[in-house]
């Protein structure tokens, strides 16, 4: 029975070394070119069986492994939790997975999230315990770990430290999550126990062990799943849309099932539905090369079979979006393929809110991942689209901000900002957050939201009438009316220019027109304990409806008193709270309503 390459998914926490580990296998350097050192798009690499046998020759006899698979196809799935949706897609495509964990740091939130994804997809996995070279005293060298793990090559203290970190940082956590796990050389039953393979992406130690274990497990337990479908049409997922010299727009894709031929029809999803286009060329990357960053030209193929990474040349691909499902079929199966693809596209629809922000991304998967991560921090999303930031986006965001300043935001993941959009942003109140790492964008969103909420709260408090109690000082009446001028002491709260003043029996007396400090300079407010001359314009006549030693109050409208009492009480000083409390008690008595302001 002919077998296809098993599809291997690589998952793990950010910076635990997923792509670096693959680099060691491929002898390439993709990680250094990625934003923030974090892999941001699913990549695909074919590792042929001859390469696996070559680097693992010392182990094949030891493990009695007779490998008959043609090789492995690795999906380099992004490691940060922000890419949950892409990892789910990667996990779903994968036959088996490698979970990369730093043996020195142990499990992180993204590690646990990755395990949950693998559980959901029912994908078997092994653990690559990376960075073994950083264990104090460890003598790490390229080659099999199992041949280096002995007292001849390692100091006893280093071996003890290795055992401690292996158990405390990896095996114990797997046990807590319901998995039996052990060092791969000690595993008796691979159907019940997770294999933990120590590796070093820096030195290459353990890479042969990893390749033998992953290949052997895939072949042993997934043989039926790996049976090559020589009759069926090809099914796949779009990785990227790329411009290639001499070819125009092309699609990079992973084919995970079936056969495709030059001259077949490509059926692929886009934002408006489905595109059908006749294939001009199927191009394969040279073995051991990374699809999104090849160092050499692709080679043409008349026919390809799963599982493989492929570049597809065909007309009318401009509107294809990364992450879209695709089928490659003969002409008589186009209609059936269209129905299948449409169903998959509909699953990617992002639900939007009645109000909220705008998010844009470069791919369907990135957009979905960004939306999912923003939802986790309770973001409201009004519009979610793939594509560059346009002037229209900015105008829309500005209109959203008119009802709520928190909606005046555009978040852009890995997209361009068009020139007219930049000009529009400069003259608008719209905030733009740009980035190539989703979790950082989410962090920036949270920071911006917090700052905006504090600013909005501060603005709202400043617009509210602040409570205050004042006392007319004896021998300090300078003018009786129009306006009345006298000296007052602020007993509680904050007296501001424009504050409406009332007497203890609830009569309106006027509003504060002017205040001066001890230097006779005009001031806008006076706080508790201050004695200041004030002018009050209105019905007040000093000596008649207001006298020396009288207690006067700033009249706070009931809706504002209620807001201060319920929403902003923690923002008030102690004396302001006292002023508000006394004022509310007075109003409840005057209005004969114990619920006034409550």
From Swiss-Prot:
* Location of the region described as G4 in the Swiss-Prot/TrEMBL record: 130-133
Q: Which HAMAP family match?
A: IF_2_A (MF_00100_A)
Location of region: G2: 37-41
Stretch list, region G1: 12-19
User: Residue limits of the tr-type G domain?
Assistant: 3-225
Q: Where is the signal peptide?
A: none
Protein's job = Function in general translation initiation by promoting the binding of the formylmethionine-tRNA to ribosomes. Seems to function along with eIF-2.
Protein name, as recorded = Probable translation initiation factor IF-2
Gene name in the database record: infB
